Amino acid sequence: HSQSLVEEEEKQEVALKDYEKNPQKYVMMPGNAIKRHVVVEDRINALKEMAETSPLNRVEENGSKIGIIAGGIAYMYAKEALGDKADYLKIGIVYPLPEKKIKEFASKYDKVFVIEELDPVIEDFCKSVGVDVIGKDVFTLQGEYTPSMIKKAVLDTDAPEFDVIDEPTPVRPPVMCAGCPHRGTFYVLKKLGLVVSGDIGCYTLGATPPLQSVDTTICMGASISAAHGMAKARGAEFNKKLVSVIGDSTFMHSGITGLVDIVYNKGNNTVIILDNSITGMTGHQDNPTTGYTIRKEETKQVNLITLCKSIGIEH
């Protein structure tokens, strides 16, 4: 999660259009979907033309013999590392990519590097249309890039070293905040030696030291559905030491259906809903259990106990 300064452009008002019934467009049954596929392909072709002239895909020339094709954070790293020692094609629209602009740009340089983290999406496209570029043969597929890494790969020059302290900086991995009520919960779960099926949120940190009590985290809501599957597969004895842990906002988002499945399939799982009345990890926004809308207007508050009882949870 991050934050940054942004520049606002002039707000454009878009007038509401009249509503028209058009099930051929909006009801995606197979017969309609086949016809709409033609529209999708036409739209992509139109986007290809737009990408060729869009200011989001721009060329920055410095009179260099080295060309750099990059977008996003990789572009910023390249600019920091290489400065005016390279020319740049800054990609702002990554799909569809501007084939003509890329070919025209690449034709001017002795070497063209594609700098992108992880999978070689732009690089593979360039090679597929006959553009000779240098990419993952000098850059790694894994992890995050740095300006010094890029400078070494492109110019074979080490970046200047900064003054460092003699003693290494103490390692401080992320942990639950001081005073967080989840700390006590995971401390107890660890002491009891339970198998904990975790979920997405601050409490995912229950997997890290010193608590180290969460055994699995897959996706939102999976703490309940995965534990339900474990109990069915491994039996009653295993289920006695198994517990699901999910936050209030994640439960509202995608945990309810898993709990319904437990009731429907006659399961007997233990589920802990960590109700801290906030969406703690991703913005501190309200959710249906807080009694306020996203605009901080008072609204009906979902009662978790009543909700669980309404789908058949008895204890």
Per-range role (PLM):
Residues H1-M176, P181-T185, K191-L194, G198:
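Flexible, low-complexity linker and terminal segments
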Residues S2-E8, M76-K79, I122-D124, T185-V188, ...:
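Short helix/loop capping segments that flank catalytic or ligand/cofactor-binding pockets
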Residues Y95-P96, P120-I122, F139-G143, Y203-L205, ...:
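Short gly/pro/ser/thr-enriched loop/turn and capping motifs at secondary-structure boundaries
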Residues A207-H315:
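Thiamine diphosphate
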Residues G72, G198-C202, I273-N276:
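Short, small-residue-rich loop/turn micro-motifs
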Residues G193-P209:
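Acidic-glycine-rich active-site phosphate/pyrophosphate-binding loop
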